[in-house]
Each structure stands twice: as C-alpha cells, then as structure tokens.
Amino acid sequence: MAEKVRDLRSALALLEQMPDQLIETEVEVDPMAELAGVYRYVGAGGTVKRPTKEGPAMIFNRIKGHPDAKVAIGLLASRKRVAALLDTQPENLGKMLCKSVENPIPPVDLEGDAPCQQVVHKAADPDFDLYKLVPAPTNTPDDAGPYITLGMCYATHPDTGVHDVTIHRLCTVSYTHL
C-alpha cells in the first residue's frame, strides 16, 4: 500500500500510481470554457448527458493568463478514487461517512510555521485581485463568472465565535469578492 494520503501532494502521488486515474497535460488551456470542455470529454468521458462516464482526474499545468498556476480537476469524481484516497473500498464510503460524523476528530494545533501559510494574499493589499490569483474556470460563456467548484471556507460565527469549515461552489464576482 502507498503512503497514507494526508494532503493534495500525497493524493496526487497515489492517483499517479493507479492505472488510468490521472492525466497531466502541458498544453495551455484557457480557463474560459476551454478547460471545462477538455475535461468534459477526457475526464468525464463524454458530454454532460447522463450517465456521465467515469474518466481520469486531470492536471492542467499551463493556464492562459496564469503562468505560475496549475488546475487539478476531477480528483473526487468517482467513488473508486475517493475510496482509494481514504484507503477503503467504494462500498464502505457511506459507513465511513456516518462513522466520521458520529465520531468527529478534534483539531490539532501545530506549533511553528504552517506550510499552508507560506504565501498569504490579503484583500487589503493594494494589488490584491482574485481574477489574477485564482485560475478558476468559467465552464460556459453563460456562467455568472469563474467558479471554484470545491471551495473550502473557514468561517467564524459573528456572535458565538464558533468556527466551521464548509465546502461551497464559489463564484468570483469581483476582484475582491467570492
């Protein structure tokens, strides 16, 4: 068995070892409709008509207008991949989810510098621009804007101070707002 998945890098490493589960391309793609179109035919295995077929996850290494960015798409698009990433079988995913909800793991506070904080962009910075920072794809010309489709939001309730992490589909609506 490969090393346990603990972050995006180890997840990609695992998928690379699995036949037909990850494709990487060096061909430049435009995040405006082209990226989603390529994935629709390669990763989703055809059109969006149901049933969507299972295809590989993809990494786009060259994004038009974003010379230092890559886009990973479809990492969680099949039960087979999700099960492999969680070191279980597809038929066990429901039970695993139920068990995790019933037995939450408390957060771990780490001392020192966090690797995820090596690069920090703040909306108050004069050159802050979400359109330049995030190569979020616009799936069709009719979309409201570029979407981060698996956006992780860390939020704090303004009155209680309770924190939570949630997953949302986030649309970039201005250079400072999602």
What residues fall within each predicted segment?
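Extended, highly charged
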Residues: M1-L178
